Each structure stands twice: as C-alpha cells, then as structure tokens.
C-alpha cells in the first residue's frame, strides 16, 4: 500500500517502513505525527484519488531526526568589473519514518 502526501509545499509518494526527508516540522525526535493531507491512496492496481484530498485518509509517521542538507553555493560575478559575490544556503529538514497508512 502506498500514499501520496503533501507536506511543506511538496508531494511525496510513501509506503509503510520508508524513511524520507521533508521540510522542517516543529516536532520532537521520536514524536508521532499525523499527516492529514493525503492526495491519493493505492494498493496494487486500485488507486483512489482525492478531490483534492482523500476524505478520512491519514498517514502516521515518527520523527527520526532533524538536520540540514548539504550547502548550495551561490556565486555571482560581473565580467571585467571586479565584482564577485559569494553566498550559500543550507535548508533544514526533518527525517520521518512512515508507520501506517489509514485509508
């Protein structure tokens, strides 16, 4: 069984037992959270789409860890003008383990 969930402005296809990194969620480590924005639920060949959400469906997950992704470097330069600008960004994430899909 799998589900398509929406969290942090992104969509993820998840199954029970998987781990995934999502945008940071303010929750403690080992806390159980419920993701209610389920867009689709499928099992085998049958799939149920929501309009836009599947009513009564939810995904239970456990917070495994919090962290930061690898640094994305930004470099701007104007040729022949001796202008260089360096920058960087590291996005925070929350790693979740999917425990159950309730449809």
From Swiss-Prot:
GO molecular function, one term: rRNA binding
Swiss-Prot/TrEMBL keywords: Ribonucleoprotein, Ribosomal protein, RNA-binding, rRNA-binding
Keyword Ribonucleoprotein found: yes
Record-linked InterPro entries: bL21-like, bL21-like_sf, Ribosomal_bL21, Ribosomal_bL21_CS
Coiled coil segments of this chain: none
The UniProt record lists the keyword Ribosomal protein: yes
GO annotations of cellular component type: cytoplasm; ribonucleoprotein complex; ribosome
Disulfide bonds: none
Protein origin, superkingdom: Bacteria
A family per Pfam: Ribosomal_L21p
SUPFAM superfamilies membership: L21p-like
Any single GO BP term: translation
Subunit structure: Part of the 50S ribosomal subunit. Contacts protein L20.
Family classification: Belongs to the bacterial ribosomal protein bL21 family.
Function: This protein binds to 23S rRNA in the presence of protein L20.
Protein name, entry field: Large ribosomal subunit protein bL21
Record organism: Burkholderia mallei (strain ATCC 23344)
